């Protein structure tokens, strides 16, 4: 007898596993990209010449709380997927934007009172709040727990 018409409801093809892996990698890429943008924005507000490891940690912590609230995530994920499908020349002048460690300004928090733009003030207030409360924050989801554990492993 042929039972090929019976399905379990669970796809076990390599294609679906590959698609899920690609989706997760795209989400992770978007998360990391947003975190670096947060870090860069903060460094610019501070008037420093480059991003330190501590800036990156601040940006990652900020993104844990903001990522799922961003209205453009779906479109941004589509953009990342399209970019990843294209063959890109990564040899752009990436070295032009790198500051040597010996020339990098030390991490220093900016005094919020020196910021004049309301949007920037809101960003820094949230950034500081998220970071300052990070050690006592209790993740509500498995994803948040994984992110917290990963970020806590960053040595500064």
Where would I find each of the regions flagged by the language model?
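Intrinsically disordered, low-complexity terminal regions
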Residues: 1-50, 57-156
